[in-house]
Structures are given as structure tokens and as C-alpha cells.
């Protein structure tokens, strides 16, 4: 039996569709939204809709942006011969927090995972190859997560890029195996970047 009104039930149901949100958390969020001032609820709804309508892939690196080319790719002070490949837009933010990396990025939006049915064609590898054929690079640093999927992706990329005459390196594993890049602190990421190795 459903104890909530149709509107509350629908709100709870929508929150449960978010990753990591179970029924109890969805209920707490729903009641928080219901109890907030109406203007705050409108602002939240508007922010969600604007993000969905305006966010797109950067034409250069495939990071998420509301412009044709993201702020990082627009920054001419960066080293154009150095590209860091990451799995997720949040990894770009994590790397930028170190203030150590001065090149550009390429965001794959995932990692190769045969068990989940994710192959190379399902992530932004083709876009990376097109980019590298049009723009020269001395080194590509692969900063995928240190788990099975990240390692598989790194090895696959290495096999594709080495014949192009590009130095391919992998960030060092100051990051725990099985961990996510976005949760690593700046010092750990800095050390991992400094200790990268060629693959």
C-alpha cells in the first residue's frame, strides 16, 4: 500500500533513479524539497533543466561544457604537445586541482569493460584518434582509474597510439588499486603524475 500522495510518490520515485540513492534517501530528499521555499524549488528545477539543455561535449576534448570549446581547450597558455586522457569529466577537475598538469585533456566518458558490454566503440576513443591525427602530440598521459577497466583501457590506447610515434605514459599508482581518480587528494595525484611511466 502506498502511504504517500501521488505527487510525493512520484518525487520519491524520480529520486530513486539517481545513482546511489535508495528509497530511504529518496524519501528524505523528497521531503526536503517539499519543505523548501517555493523559489528554492524553482531554482533547483531550473538548474536541472538548464544543465540538461545547455551542456554538450567540447568539440576538442569531449569534456562537458556549455560552450562549443571548453575553458581548458580555449587556454592558449597550456602545452599543446601534452594530452592527458581521463575517463570522466570529474577526473579533469581532480587533475586540475593539483595545479601540476599544464597540457590539455581528452575525456573518454567511460572505460572498456567487456563484462558490462562496453567496448572501445562505446567510449570517446575514435574522437581521440581523430584529434591526434589532426594535431601533433609528444606525449599522451593515460590517467584512467587503477582498476581492471582502467588498465584494460590504458593497454588498448597504448597499442593504438604507439604506432603513431607518440610517447604513451601511465600515471603512477599513488592512487590505490580499485580507487577512483576523483576521490584522490591533490598530493596523491601530483605524485602519481610525477611518477608516470611509459607503457
UniProtKB/Swiss-Prot annotation:
CDD domains xref list: TOPRIM_recR (cd01025)
SMART domains on file: HhH1, TOPRIM
Coiled-coil residue spans: none
GO molecular function: DNA binding; zinc ion binding
Residue ranges constituting the Toprim domain according to the UniProt record: 81-176
PANTHER family associated with the record: RECOMBINATION PROTEIN RECR (PTHR30446:SF0)
Primary role: May play a role in DNA repair. It seems to be involved in an RecBC-independent recombinational process of DNA repair. It may act with RecF and RecO.
GO biological process, one term: DNA repair
Gene: recR
Protein name: Recombination protein RecR
Keywords: DNA damage, DNA recombination, DNA repair, Metal-binding, Zinc, Zinc-finger
Pfam families: RecR_C (PF21175), RecR_HhH (PF21176), RecR_ZnF (PF02132), Toprim_4 (PF13662)
Family: Belongs to the RecR family.
Zn finger limits (C4-type): 58-73
